Amino acid sequence: MRRISAVSAVAAAAVVALAGCGTGSGKSSTDSQKVVPTSATLSGSITFQTWSLKNDKFTPYFTKLVADFQAAHPGTTVNWVDQPGDGYATKVTSQVTSGSLPDVINLPPDIAHAVAKTGDLLDLTKNVPTLATDYVKSGLTAYTYADINGGADSYGFPWYLGTDVSYWNKEMMAKDGLDATKPPKTFDELVAQAKIMHDASGGKDYLMSRSPGLSDIVNSGTKLMTDDGKKFAFNTAGAAAMIDKYTTAFKAGYLPSNVLNDKYEGNTSLFQKGQVAWTTGGGQLIDSTRQSNPTMADKILPSPALDTAPLYVQGLSVSSKSKNAALALAFAQFATNDKNQVAFVSLAKGFLPGSAASANDPQFSKSDGTPQGDASVIAYKDMQAAVNFTPPVWTDAMNTLLNQEVAKAMTGKETAQQALDNTVNQANSLLTQ
């Protein structure tokens, strides 16, 4: 199963180019805004495309899903196809330009945005009256775009979602005078406790172990883009102040010295080795750690993510050019109803359903009293208000640029404001290429 994440630089460039070219017929906008008649008996066939999900683990689930739908609607056929993990955005680009986009298609928000810009995805708000009550709000928001009809449309049913939970090494924290049952809740509290750990250990132990990124900028109270979604605009005083706090902490020795260079192993790796006392990860991190490092797993306690949690989401979209839109819409709703979503994430450990009704399911709302049980419930609660921080037009090249500029600021080569100005200006230039 493919992890929910941004697409590669090449793939991102492909979908941005697709949106920029406005590929599609002259009636694409009208197609996306149409209302699909749903009163007639369903019949005929459609194609349903997933992304890197045809394997021993998930194939039985999808085989049954399709069979159940066809049994409930005699005379219908759902042809399930799956695309490999690599090159998916490029494949979707090819499908749009050739007019062969599947009727129901698995898309993350960034690729969905590019396809929606061409008018090739159906607006679900006009076709599903219960959309806002049937699905998790945070997931729906990820498929609304400010630069398409002012953000009034929605182009994906939230399907399987993820978020981050904070994890703490209680043994390491206790040694340095901190209590993992009273962890930081905000970035400022994190810095304060990082100082305590640093001072108590003589600079040998670390609570913080990563440089700031987009999520930190958003959590500083900064909007990443203009209200119309057409330009980056995160070079604010608030964002600069946040980077300055990281810089001060870095210079004081609260972060590992290699956090800004190629020798940096990553926050999670350092945590698993017992070299830092805090990391973030999905709701199943303790269980996954137990498989590789049982001793470490017993030292971990979870808590909600600092400030606002990030959202990772995959969804199902409906082609506005489908020749059997009624069947496509019905199947997409069936595949993402509460029963089928819960069944799917029971196989996809660490992910959460995008159905609103899952909030009433004890497996997501009640802990069994173990740290892992607590983490699972925390993840589900965090997901409700989580935010997809990454704009759909943000590419790997832009992220590399941000990291380089932040590193310059944290090492005193330029001010935080200069770093943000440079990043915003160059990222906006990349948008027009």
Identify the residue ranges that each predicted region occupies.
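Hinge/lid segment of periplasmic solute-binding proteins
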Residues: P109-T163, A297, K381
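Extracytoplasmic/periplasmic substrate-binding proteins
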Residues: W51, I243-A330
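Extracytoplasmic "Venus flytrap"/periplasmic binding protein-like
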Residues: D68-S138, K175-G177, A277-W278, P353-G354
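C-terminal capping/gating helix-and-loop segments adjacent to ligand/active sites or protein-protein/ligand interfaces
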Residues: D374-T423
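Short, solvent-exposed loop/beta-turn-alpha elements that line the ligand-binding surface or hinge
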Residues: T125-S138, P183-K185, A200-S201, T222-M242, ...
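Short, low-complexity disordered leader/linker segments with a strong preference
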Residues: M1-T47, A71, N428-Q433
